[in-house]
């Protein structure tokens, strides 16, 4: 659900926290259109467009998992500030022994995050930003605390037709492990994510297209599963179809497949007035890792829509992670500055 983080902890940090982020493929570091939640991926996106904005987000995920967040922003001269709180509840789970026998008793699991965001305008077209993120998780009676940070930069032309963003997310590690016993191992790192994104808005058509390149700090996005590790092949020349099928079963991935697993593509239909938007995106990593072989699904695709009605923004998004498992998200944003006038 939260992205495939491999050996790191706090994988929920990879989950899109709003309908807009979900519709953009789960992550976006370049789009600046007054949507407050995009600053959660790149703190430099926080701009004067979001002054005194309050945004509430809710997500219903697979298997009864619920997530909610609230974000508020305020500007002071050339400085932009925002604070967000996120809560993820995995619901009730049953105790079971090592053989899978359930006792009938249940326990809960929750993740919580506070996001303190700052950005500063360094000219008419360039901003930088940073965020500090205390993180707390409790699973049954085991708890963990971590501290993370994000840094980012954002550029856009004066007419906003072209936007470029760069962000390094989740710099940090656990300060308190879930378990401090002799076999608990070292403190885990957070799921680091170096991203570069851009988008272009056509001058004479209500269309914006863009791409995000994520996880740039790591070429091989595979992980070990059932004793098999993902490995990248430069060529399958000379291999029969049976040999290639066997190699795939053992974790082989072609280089161009791995390259596209680093990309997210999106298409925005949005008029100049920005009174509404319709967004379609494709995340190849989600599809490659979560789609079930030989079965049709929309894994990797996300669809979203939003309305901007005077002082209120509404957003809705839908994505399928695997067959029968969906995420539905809704967002409500209020322009408090306009409401008080």
What do the PLM-derived regions correspond to, one by one?
Residues 2-341:
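Subset of outer-membrane beta-barrel
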């Amino acid at each position: 659900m939260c992205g495939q983080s491999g050996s790191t902890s706090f994988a929920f940090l990879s989950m899109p926290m709003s309908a807009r982020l979900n519709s953009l493929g789960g992550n976006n570091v370049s789009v600046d259109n007054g949507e407050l939640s995009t600053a959660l991926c790149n703190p430099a996106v926080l701009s004067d467009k979001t002054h005194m904005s309050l945004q509430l987000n809710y997500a219903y995920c697979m298997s009864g998992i619920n997530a909610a967040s609230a974000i508020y922003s305020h500007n002071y001269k050339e400085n932009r500030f925002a604070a967000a709180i996120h809560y993820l509840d995995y619901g009730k789970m049953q105790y079971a022994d090592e053989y899978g026998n359930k006792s009938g008793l249940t326990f809960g699991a929750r993740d919580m995050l506070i996001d303190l965001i700052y950005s500063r305008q360094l000219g008419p077209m360039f901003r930088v930003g940073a965020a500090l993120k205390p993180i707390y998780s409790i699973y049954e009676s085991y708890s963990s605390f971590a501290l993370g940070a994000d840094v980012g930069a954002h550029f856009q032309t004066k007419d906003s037709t072209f936007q470029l963003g760069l962000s390094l997310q989740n710099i940090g590690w656990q300060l308190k492990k879930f378990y401090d016993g002799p076999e608990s191992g070292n403190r885990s790192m957070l799921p680091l994510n170096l991203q570069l994104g851009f988008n272009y808005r056509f001058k004479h058509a209500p269309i914006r297209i863009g791409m995000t390149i994520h996880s740039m700090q790591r070429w091989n996005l595979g992980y070990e599963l059932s004793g098999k590790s993902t490995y990248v092949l430069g060529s399958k020349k000379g291999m029969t179809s049976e040999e290639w099928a066997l190699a795939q079963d053992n974790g082989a991935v072609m280089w161009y497949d791995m390259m596209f697993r680093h990309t997210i593509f999106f298409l925005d239909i949005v008029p100049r007035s920005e009174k509404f938007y319709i967004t379609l995106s494709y995340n190849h990593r989600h599809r490659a890792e979560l789609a079930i072989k030989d079965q049709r699904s929309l894994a990797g695709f996300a669809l979203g829509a939003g309305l901007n009605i005077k002082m209120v923004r509404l957003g809705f998004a839908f994505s399928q992670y695997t067959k029968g498992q969906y995420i539905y998200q809704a967002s409500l944003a209020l322009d408090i500055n306009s409401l008080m006038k």
